[in-house]
Structures are given as C-alpha cells and as structure tokens.
Amino acid sequence: MGSMKKSIQWSAVVILGVTACTPALKLTPSDADVVLARQILEAPDPGQPGSFRVQRLYYGSGTDKNRSEYRDSVAITTPTVDVSKMVSLGASASERNDYWDFTPKEMPLNARVWYPDGEGPFPLVLVVHGNHDMRDFSDPGYDYFGELLASRGYILVSVDENFINGGIRGENDARGWFLLRHVQLFEEFNAEAGNPFEGKVDMSNIVLMGHSRGGEAVANAAAFNNLTHYPDDASLKFDFGYDIKGVISIAPVDGQYLPTGRPVVIEDMSYLTFHGSHDGDVTSFHGLRIYDRMKFNDPDTFNFKSAVYVYRANHGQWNSVWGSHDSGPRSARILDLRGLIPEEDQRRFAEIYVSAFLEVVTRGDKSYLPIFRDHRVIGEWLPETMYITRFETSAFQPLANFEEDIDVTSGSEHGVTIAGDSLATWKEANLLLRSSNRANTSASQDNQGVTVGWNNRMAGPDTTVHGPTARYTLGLPAGLAADWRLSAGSTLDFMLAPTNDVPGPRKAPTSEDDEEEEEDNEDDETDAAGRGGDDDEEEEDPDVDLSIELLDSSGRMARVTLSEYGAVRRPLDTYVMRRGDREAARFQTHWEMILQTYSIPLRDFLADNRSLDVRQITQISFVFDQVHAGEVIIDQVGFSDLDPGFLGARVEGN
C-alpha cells in the first residue's frame, strides 16, 4: 500500500472561449468521470417524485395590495404581526410603506404551501428566501422543492418575506422570528376543526430551510426557539419551543445578525449546508462557520452535520425566480456566467441532498446516511461536477482541533501530543475565506487548522537523493483508545486539503560553505511562486497523496492510502467576475480553501495488519510518502463511533 497512487488528473486551468473582448474562461479540469464513476447506494433516488398527489394553497392576510395570490386566493386568512422591534425601514420607510400599504407594525403572515393528498400526519418543512429586489417576488422560486417534497409526503411551506427585502439592513433576526411565527400558525391549523391541515401536521418533525439571508435566518430561528426573550430587547417575549429536528442553509450569509454581539450557535439538531463555488452574491462559503459553531451536547443522541461545496454552482439558481443573475439585471456585464452548471443540474443536486436529509432526520431512514459520509456512493445520481464534502456526527471525539491554545505540540484532548519530522512547514493558523469585502464577516472561516508542508528530496543536482520521509504525528496517552472503546467499527476522521504551495528541496549543510552552496541550489530550484522544481522535469506539480498510519503500544503498524477515501484535490480555480481587476479587488485568492472530510474505518487498518490492536493505539501519523513534495491543511482529527448506516454503502477499495 506504499506505492504512489494518482487517481486525480491535475492541470492549472482549462482555457475556453477566448475572444477579442472576453477573457479566457478558467476552470479546474473536472474529475467527475473518475470520482462519480460508480453507483453503490441501492436505496431509491430521493430526488425522484413520490407517490402522493400534490395539493397547493395560499394563506395570508387577504388584503395584499401587490400580490393577488395573497389577496384573492387565500384559503386561510391569517393575522398581521408587529415586528417593529426587529425591523427598521430607515430613510426608505415612506416609499416602502406606500408600496406595500403596511408598516412593520402590521406585517402579514403569507405563504404558499405544497402538501400531500393524504391523511398524514406529515413532517413540516418551511423554506424562506433571502434578500432580493422586493418587487421581484422570491417565494415562488422554491416550487421545485414544493412539488418534489409534497409528492414524497412532506408539507412544504414557502414563506413570503419580500416586504423586508430590498435596501434595508439589520433585519435577519426578524426573518428568523417570522419562520417560528409560521410554525405557530401550523400548530393552530393542526388543531382547528375544518382547517385543511387539521390533524395532518406532524409537529414533532419540523425542519427549517433558508437561502442566502434566509440561510442565516434559519439558524437564528433555531436559536430563538429555545429562548424566552428576544436577546436585543427583553420586553419582547418568546414562547416557541417546537420540535425542530434539522436546519438547512443554502448559500447562507453569516454574521449579519449578532445577538449581544456574538454569533448564533445551533445546538442538538442535524444541519445541512451547501454552497456554489461561483456564487456571485454571497461569494464565500459562510455556511462553514455555522457548521463549525454547531454543538452536539449529547453524544448518545443521534445528530449529524454535513456541508457540500458544489463546483461551478452559483447563488441564484437555487431559486427558480432568481436564476443566474447574482448581481441583478446587469449580471451578464459584471459576472462571468459561462462556467456555471445548468440550473436544472444545480437544483437536481439540491433535490437529492435536501430530500435525503429529510428522510434521515424526520423519518429515521438511515439508508441515505452514506450520501453524507461519501458522495461518491451516488455517482450516477449527481450532476457531473466536482464536490467537496464535510460531515461530522454527535459521536465524534476530537483529538486535535487546533483551537485551544498556541502550543503546536499539544492536542485538544488531555495528554495528546503532536510532533513533526522532516517538515518544511508546520504552523497553526486561522483559515481564510476568499472574499475580502467585509473584514468582520467575510474574510475568515473562524476556524483554526494546521498547515504541514514537506519536500523529501535533498537540494542539489541529483534529484534522486531523498531524506527521511516527512511525517506529522499525533501521540495518544496510554489507555485513551481503550477508554474511548475503539473497535474495528470505529472510524478515524479528519479534514484535509492540499494547498497550492510546494516547498523547495531540503538543505543538508555539513559546513558553512556547504550551507551557502545549498542555499544557492535551492534558489535555482524554486520558482517565483515558491514551488520547488527539478532540472530534469517539466511536468506540473504532482497530485497530492499521502498515507495514514496507526501504531499500537506493541509497535505494530498498519497503513492506508488517503486517496482511497476520496479525491485529494488542490483548491479549485474560481473566477467569478468578467474583469480581472474587479476579481482581484474583491477576492483575496482565486480559490476557496475548503477542507474535505475523510472517514477511515479502523477495520481497514486491520485488513492491512490483522495483529494491530485498535484498543492500544498510541500514534496516528500522516506520512508523506506518496509524492515527494506538497503542503496540506489538516483539522478536526479524531475518532467516531458511527451509526452503522453511514457505512451501509462504500466505494469499492475503501
């Protein structure tokens, strides 16, 4: 298992569509033909319609000035609400009040509903849009979710919040509060004799879904659900406490609402977030921050979180009204739209993941869990693009998350030590986001990781001379593996991603003169980007791969190769703007640094060495033996006692 494996073909860019006035389109070549080559999961496709006939209705004020469906077509008339403590219209108040014919003291509870024709009770799913032109109504844009999910036995409610769209700020707390107020309506509908939803709503199975600002709003709602008072004005009392089982954030913002100056934390439920690389509006994956802050307080209660980065997806195509125009009507002049995946493919991905998430979270159908551990098991279902995925369960126990102190030799769990051998780079640092337009909300992932770089070649004209193989090792205290009850069914989990940097060859000075000569050689062999080169090679930097090694207290070792457990990719090239100067001004880099989760069953190490005692593991090593040089970022190293469902389908070879 020590031989070099190269399953991912790498090239810097694909150059397409060069004309006199349009710059070349730059995309990382797709590896979908390899990564998505198999269909292992045998469960039914969750993105296909179910057996229920779909019914539709509107509810609302019945007096809407601008929208006939909420004026003339409401099946249920609902009250107005006072959100003036949360919504300030500022200088636009007069214009907005004239347009809508109401103020924040009397805003409506409007929504369109898709629901199954059946007895029920059915799980309740609410979706809320984000910010957009308030006159270009956003709530119809999730019709594709409505049709699919209602046919599969869910009540899908698309909430109207267009009246707080447009040019106002500081309203994302209200967006979340509105969602809970709509949940309260369904509690009333469910109990009301003669109501179309009488007895049909499963109030013990609620999921909140939001897009853009709505993606942060659902996190706010999940937090508000457990509070008795509004954090920013305790005179406003809350009385919710609903059984919210999961939250879904689609291309969310984060940090627009900071109650008492602190970010919102979701606790003890399941979470799904996804984001497109070519998002021209929310230009960084802010859902990763919500994901990282999420807390599982009870390891014995099953919950999980999942994040997916979809290459070449944009912001607006998650909504059928918004489409490809992430920067408004003039998007084609501002954004480079040529690299986007088709909108039907983008929504097909969303249908699969959202539906599978709902099946797991509301119905306990764990046959879909493998999708979240390793997307490669559904290669035939997924649109042909590249995906970077993360997942973690409530059963994860961290050894090192690189958050607790400034000592690079200590782990997060007491007694865990860290050591490096023959490394060119070893540092812990905050991970950045590519967007630089807001320093407090857009520049950082708010998450630490460790950067490890290596070059096993020795400096000099003979490129066949190598030093000791570089490695990065976590040492476990005696008894920890036994205390954690590690077994063949446990998994070693971590996040990792290569960077674009490649250190130069190692120096091995034997004297002052030799040291100067080595430095001269290194200067000759390192290009302007800091990448090591070889005199006799013209090829691109090799694909990154490495080995993962376990050692027990008796010195028995087992090793697997990382690429067997998922693609190991350098950052994916992302150019959103048509003009290079605008791209450079808006973004720190032309890629987003997204770490991939790798989940390796300990039984795979036992397959390499049956004598390994997993109850006596003392070391975990990242061994850089597959390519001579590279650099990776590592985070969240630990063990999980996964629900067996996660391993119910696995790509052959891992």
Describe the predicted segments one by one:
Residues 137-157:
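Short amphipathic alpha-helix adjacent to the substrate-entry channel of hydrolases
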Residues 121-130:
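Short beta-strand element of the alpha/beta-hydrolase
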Residues 217-221, 282:
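Hydrolases whose catalytic domains are alpha/beta-hydrolase-1, hotdog thioesterase
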Residues 265-343:
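Active-site-adjacent alpha-helix of alpha/beta-hydrolase-fold enzymes
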Residues 118-120, 170-216, 224:
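Gly/Ser-rich "nucleophile elbow"/oxyanion-hole loop immediately N-terminal to the catalytic nucleophile
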Residues 25-31, 39-44, 311-315, 321-479, ...:
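Alpha/beta-hydrolase-fold serine-hydrolase catalytic core, especially in secreted/extracellular enzymes
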Residues 25-120:
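Short conserved active-site loop signatures built around small residues
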Residues 463-609, 625-648:
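Extracellular ligand-binding interfaces
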